[in-house]
Design a protein with these regions (language model features):
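Short glycine-/polar-rich loops that comprise or flank the Walker A/P-loop
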Residues: 34-38, 102-106, 134-144
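Flexible phosphate/Mg2+-sensing switch loops adjacent to catalytic phosphate-binding sites
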Residues: 15-25, 133-137
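Conserved strand-helix element at the start of the C-terminal RecA-like helicase core
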Residues: 1-6
């Protein structure tokens, strides 16, 4: 995820971040990054409350977002059907179980050490029944990409790869 975060930033994305200010959750996005497409991290380093708020923003569930934050987000967009607020939602193993995501059109599996059952769980987060009902019928699809690494013969025979 760290490398993909850098790739996104190099391609004009900004991280969707929150902070608590005076007891209220507020956006923590630099002024120069406002208006850029954003990505969010769901890694286990965030508090449970913060992760839940970010997930609700991604899902467009405004009724579960604190009012101060909701007002700020609605200045960006009134929904997140097409990624208007958060376009990319990156999850580590901490996000593989127990959450539902809405309107997710693409799943990219980039961590090589996941067990096949875990991969199916991750895909299942994006393919829940009725999770795409707010989208037009032709957009109610989920494409899954599994990235694999392949070593060359030279790399396999070299002692440098041990």
């Amino acid at each position: 995820i760290g490398i993909f975060k850098l790739v996104l930033e190099a391609n004009g994305f900004a991280e969707f971040k929150l902070k608590k200010e005076g007891g209220n959750w507020v956006l923590d996005i630099k002024e120069e990054d406002r208006g850029k497409p954003t990505f969010a991290l769901y890694t286990g380093t965030e508090s449970d409350e913060e992760k839940e708020i970010v997930r609700n923003v991604f899902n467009g569930d405004w009724k579960f977002i604190p009012p101060t934050l909701e007002a700020q987000i609605k200045l960006i967009s009134g929904n997140n059907l097409y990624g208007e607020v958060i376009k990319v939602f990156m999850i580590t193993a901490s996000g593989a179980e127990g959450i539902s995501l809405k309107n997710t059109r693409y799943v990219h599996i980039m961590e090589p050490y996941w067990h096949p059952v875990r991969i199916q769980q991750v895909i299942g987060r994006a393919r829940r029944i009725c999770s795409h009902q707010e989208l037009p019928e032709e957009l109610r699809t989920v494409d899954v990409f599994l990235y694999l690494m392949e070593f060359s013969e030279e790399q396999l025979s070299s002692d440098d790869t041990i």
